[in-house]
Structure formats: structure tokens, C-alpha cells
Amino acid sequence: IQRIGKCGSRTVVLLLRILSEKHGFNLVTSDIHNKTRLTKNEQMELIKNISTAEQPYLFTRHVHFLNFSRFGGDQPVYINIIRDPVNRFLSNYFFRRFGDWRGEQNHMIRTPSMRQEERYLDINVCILENYPECSNPRLFYIIPYFCGQHPRCREPGEWALERAKLNVNENFLLVGILEELEDVLLLLERFLPHYFKDVLSIYKNPEHRKLGNLTVTVKKTVPSPEAIQILYQRMRYEYEFYYYVKEQFHLLKRKFGLKSHIRKPRPRPEFFIPSPLETEEPIDDEEEDDEKWLEDIYKR
């Protein structure tokens, strides 16, 4: 299971920890959280570790797609969840600055070196004045997780988009939508019952729901309509990928007789053709893997 920042991965990992004890499988959660791109040797080492681990088990990490067959290995079962790109970006923007409901000082733990002027930078200023954090290539975030380790996967454009779509079709058992998480969990329970049996009932448990509220990012504000439209334009390829995955997910749901019971989505944004984008280094995911506190509370 790849973990994409601010796409519900902490909720999923908490569920997996409960399920691993209930069903007797191993859960391996990597303690490396800010290295999604690997050298060839690092890829080979990680593939070796995953391929030789004691089964049955699930492995989770923030890492871009790895092609096991390229190194002579058997391709594993890939699972992932993505989210509306603008909502993901806004959640990450404020999470880096102010954390979540676990405590007022949570943001100080996560970004202790952040300057005050950066921490309190108005989101509209960041977007409208084209600050690096609110511009490409840093907004090109979701697609590289599916495109893979090739350098061109970090360049916003059609090549990375099409390669990401191809990998979704050929290498992923399921790519779900966070906005429809209950249906994602229901499909996982059908596809992989040894791992996910009863996951939906656990997720709906009032105690779990109460804990889930603690991971909600605080102090989020909504950008102006002008700023939102600019984000849509800058995230053109992210949205093309998001809607492609969403359509594939809905096809899968219909195949298994699931009906959507979700709020009406916002209309698709209208995009203009952007000017060529320079390739720079996107920021790494700064979300720390800190779910142990959730697990401990749940077991009290």
C-alpha cells in the first residue's frame, strides 16, 4: 500500500494495525517518510526486502511506484487511495503549519524550523503571487506516485500522466477515492478478505470515528475563487488523472453492484493550456508516520 500524503493514509494504517491483530497477518510500516524517489540500488534493496518478508503481510510506505519485474521480481498487489487534488493540497498546506487536533503544539513538532512568516503566510498570497509551495512542480504530487521512479515522472506533462494511467490499469488491484472511503473499504473486504474482513464495521465503530476526528487538519481556510481557479489551472494534469481514476473506480463499483451515496461533487474545472513548465525538485512529503498514539488510545 503506497501512502500518499493527506489522502487518508493515517486512517488506513490505524485500521490495518487493528486488522493485523484480528486476522494474524504481518503489517510492515516503513519508518522512512520523506524519501519517495530511490536510486537503482535503493530500489533493488527495497524490492528484495519486500519479496523475502514473511507472509502473509502488508507493506506500507510513502514511495513512488516500483516496477518489481524490472529487477526480476514478482509484482506485488498494489493498493492506493487518492483525493481531490486541490483538497489534498490545502490539507497539506495547513497541516504542515498547524498540525491537527492531537494538540495545539502539534505543528511545532512537525515543522520546528519553519519561520513564523512562512507559517502564517496567507494561502491567497502564496497562490496569487506564485510562491514555490503553491506552484508547479510542487503541485504535481499525486501522479508521480503512480508513474514511478523515472526522472520524467516528476515533470508535469502528458508523458507522466499516461504512464501513471497505464500503471493503474496494469499493476494496481484497486485505486480508490478518499471521498468514497466506505466503498473503498467494502471492495477491499471483497477482494482481500484475509486482510480486510470486518474493516467496514471497525471503521464505522463510534470509537474509531471519534479518533478519526483527531487527525483532521486545523486552521484550514478556503482560498478565494480566483485563487482556486488558478490552482485548477496549475493542477490540470493532476485533475485529469484524478477523474480518470474516479471513473475507473465507479466502473468497478458498478461491476460489484455498489451504488454511490455521496454528496454532489463540484463540477469539473475548465482548464486552459498552460505554458511549458520547468522541471524542479518537488518537495518531499513531510507528514510523519505517527499513528502509535491512535492505536494506544483505541486499545484503552
Feature annotation, model-predicted:
Residues 1-54, 60-65, 98, 148-149, 163, 198-300:
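PAPS-dependent sulfotransferase catalytic core
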